[in-house]
Swiss-Prot record:
Origin: domain of life: Bacteria
Gene name linked to the record: rimP
Major subcellular location class: cytoplasm
Cross-referenced InterPro entries: Ribosome_maturation_RimP, RimP_C, RimP_C_sf, RimP_N, RimP_N_sf
Annotated organism of origin: Shewanella oneidensis (strain ATCC 700550 / JCM 31522 / CIP 106686 / LMG 19005 / NCIMB 14063 / MR-1)
Protein's recorded name: Ribosome maturation factor RimP
Reported function: Required for maturation of 30S ribosomal subunits.
Length: 151
């Protein structure tokens, strides 16, 4: 069965792309009565607040019609930012060599939290160099993955 995030991504991809943006990813955080639906968008020339507002109106209209979430939630539309979350194998592959922070569902090498450089993406498997040790993580074991911004 598809997750809520994947169903929402399928539902919102076309409307976001119709406005000239890429749907980078979806994050749904349940926090009791105050759940949050985060929609991350990206564009060739970056994203500004007006872009977010336009996408928010379009996404809100689609969600009002489709009504995929039965509880109250707050809709947030933003760019992925410098510490961008990663959602797909293609996104991880685009950042080979970059440092990432991973939160895992099941421990790998005794830890559910890893920081290291992406060395390879092979299908649905991600290789990460953590303190000189090569670890392999299944993408479906990653609860949350973010680029570690370098300043």
């Amino acid at each position: 069965m598809a997750t809520l995030e994947s169903r929402l991504a399928d539902m919102l991809k076309v409307p976001v792309e119709a406005l000239g943006f890429q749907l980078w990813g979806i994050e749904y955080v349940q926090a009791g009565k105050h759940s949050i639906l985060r929609v991350f968008i990206d564009g060739e020339n970056g994203i500004n607040i007006e872009d977010c507002a336009n996408v928010s109106r379009q996404v809100s209209a689609v969600l009002d019609v489709e009504d995929p979430i039965s509880t109250e939630y707050t809709l947030e539309v933003s760019s992925p930012g410098v510490d961008r979350p990663l959602f797909t194998a293609e996104q991880y592959a685009a950042y080979v060599g970059e440092d990432v922070k991973l939160q895992l569902t099941m421990p790998v090498a005794g830890s559910r939290n890893l920081k290291g450089a992406i060395t390879q993406v092979d299908g649905q498997m991600l290789s990460v160099n953590v303190n000189g040790k090569e670890l392999v993580v299944a993408l479906d074991n990653i609860r949350k993955g973010n680029i570690i911004a370098k300043f």
